[in-house]
């Protein structure tokens, strides 16, 4: 497969969307064909599922397993209809959240067993995996402040942003643990730095890693 797959992970309000936009502009300037996308979402069908999931109705009425299954359904559609075809065409795909968010959000405290999540992941991935995952890491208190500010500005309404500080910190630690388990894929970025400092770090990493792998 001739393309390159980069994902962005982290808690709420860490700045993933901003950094994806800035990296896309950088890569466009270098002549790469870039696709930006997100999860849950990325296709018409997956966006419908996104709306349901972020409303919190599934978690409240059906529980974490059904929630994980719906995330997987959205991912299957997203991978088969958008990510895989784009990679086959040689595009650089930048995705806001992917498998690691499912591992953290649905797997935290064994809400859904790791074995079940592994099966769902296998169904969805079609053998693809990100070459680089940027983990934007900020303290949970900072994450909650940013998420609250975003809600006040009516930029988004997200069920997961409403979770208490303890849960947010547990998710942060779970992401960091994943990064320790797969250091070849993860790049942990201090999300408390300025937007430009973070963007430059990400650009430098991509330029170095992708130099010998893409034309």
From Swiss-Prot:
Domain of life assignment: Bacteria
Documented EC number(s): 2.7.4.9
Cellular component GO terms held in the UniProt record: cytosol
Residues the record lists as binding ATP: 10-17
Catalytic activity: dTMP + ATP = dTDP + ADP
Alphabetized Pfam families for the sequence: Thymidylate_kin
Keyword presence, rRNA processing: no
A biological-process GO annotation: dTDP biosynthetic process
Annotated GO MF terms: ATP binding; dTMP kinase activity
Top-rank EC class of the record's enzyme: transferase
Keywords for the protein's UniProt record, in alphabetical order: ATP-binding, Kinase, Nucleotide biosynthesis, Nucleotide-binding, Transferase
Entries under SUPFAM superfamilies matching the protein: P-loop containing nucleoside triphosphate hydrolases (SSF52540)
Family: Belongs to the thymidylate kinase family.
HAMAP family found in the cross-reference section: Thymidylate_kinase (MF_00165)
Function (record text): Phosphorylation of dTMP to form dTDP in both de novo and salvage pathways of dTTP synthesis.
Full protein name: Thymidylate kinase
Organism: Bartonella henselae (strain ATCC 49882 / DSM 28221 / CCUG 30454 / Houston 1)
This protein's encoding gene: tmk
């Amino acid at each position: 497969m001739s393309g390159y797959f980069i994902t962005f992970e982290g808690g709420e309000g860490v700045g993933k969307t901003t950094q994806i936009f800035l990296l896309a502009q950088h890569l466009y300037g270098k002549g790469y064909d870039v696709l930006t996308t997100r999860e849950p979402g990325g296709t018409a069908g997956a966006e419908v599922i996104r709306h349901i999931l972020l409303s919190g109705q599934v978690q409240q009425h059906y529980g974490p397993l059904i929630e994980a299954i719906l995330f997987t359904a959205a991912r299957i559609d997203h991978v088969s209809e958008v990510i895989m075809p784009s990679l086959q065409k040689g595009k650089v795909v930048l995705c806001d959240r992917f498998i690691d968010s499912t591992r953290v959000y649905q797997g935290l405290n064994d809400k859904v067993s790791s074995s079940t999540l592994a099966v769902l992941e296998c169904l969805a991935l079609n053998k693809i995996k990100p070459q680089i995952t940027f983990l934007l890491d900020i303290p949970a208190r900072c994450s909650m402040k940013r998420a609250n500010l975003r809600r006040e500005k009516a930029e988004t309404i997200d069920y997961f942003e409403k979770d208490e500080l303890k849960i947010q910190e547990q998710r942060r630690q779970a992401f960091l643990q994943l990064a320790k388990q797969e250091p070849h894929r993860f790049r942990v970025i201090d999300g408390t730095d300025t937007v430009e400092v973070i963007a430059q770090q990400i650009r430098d990493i991509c330029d170095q890693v992708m130099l010998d792998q893409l034309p």
